[in-house]
Amino acid sequence: MKTIYIYCEGPTEESFINTVLYPYFFALGIYVRPIVCETRRDANRKYRGGVSRYAKIKSELMILCKSHPHEYVTTMFDYYAMPSDTPGIADATTDIFERINKIESIINEDIGERNCKFHFMLYEFEGILFSKPETFSLIAGDEVVTAVQRIREEFETSEHINNSPETAPSKRLEALIPGYAKIKNGTQLSDAMGIHTIMKQCPHFKRWIQDMAAW
């Protein structure tokens, strides 16, 4: 089996990879392994999750690529709130898919490793959870399901749900569901709706999955 290392932002993405992506790719003869970003290291402890500087991401990705030259490396980082030193991040192309493809290409060129393909989640991981609003009945009442459905209907796709500090997908869910647990609930919801539903509703995510399957 070939291996794809997915360098990801934190434990929420790690749980999603292990629970949702792993069985899908295992059936295709591909082993996906999450590697969580380390924000810093002390003598006796590692701190995982979050993104502070692009330079740190680049350095870790290059090490990962060179350590596994015959395997593939990709990423799972939220486009929302990426560091300002990220190459191409200031691009203002109106179409979000065109913009994100351009930025990913610029980053891939900057990293310069043939076995690396950078991938952003639009606008963040929680965006994919709007792919099937009725799934929220697993963790909340009908009023929340209706509210999630209304939000989804405002946008062309789940990946268009925007990225301001007040209206990013995670902020919307936290406002709707007191005590919303990102790791537990995010994994539960995405697993229940299934990868095929997510791919149908999220074109950029779908292309990423297809690219990995074709490597």
What residue ranges belong to the model's regions?
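Non-catalytic terminal and connector segments of soluble metabolic enzymes
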Residues: 48-54
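Extreme N-terminal starter segment of soluble prokaryotic enzymes
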Residues: 1-4
